[in-house]
Amino acid sequence: DVPPIIAALISTEDVRYRGHSGIDLMSLVRVGVKTVLMQNTSQGGGSTITQQLAKNLFPRDTARNRSRVARTAKLVTSKFKEWITALKLEYNYTKEEIAAMYLNTVEFGSNAYGIKSAAHTFFNKEPHELNIQEAALLAGLVKGPTMYSPRRNPENALARRNLVLDRMASA
């Protein structure tokens, strides 16, 4: 039986999580087409949970005083490092271990980093005590901890939680 927080995370952040080895080629192609053909350079949408973990473990250098070419080169280099790290993580750990590591490193907002801190901050519970609605709310925070904060933006938090619940039901 998959804990609700894991089910919520996978259904929202990486629906093909169990079927790839750290890099989701279908998502990469989709993002590539969106970026190149449609000239849509909005960030996000192609990283797997494993890639997001790699990024959390080894943050990018975000210096802003570089030229556009230098920033692009740095982004490409960091993406390749992220992919290699994701493949190594998948080789050395189980999917359950990777999901747990991710949940223990991600920001949930309100100064809560990691699922244990988030469960205590928002619900005064241990992670294993979360019900499906609470797990869905926390999983929804990952995309935008401030935008979907139940404290700052309760309407957004509720709508995001409901989206996560819908995705869980569809999975």
Predicted regions located by residue number:
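Peptidoglycan glycan-strand catalytic modules in the bacterial/periplasmic cell-wall system
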Residues: 1-171
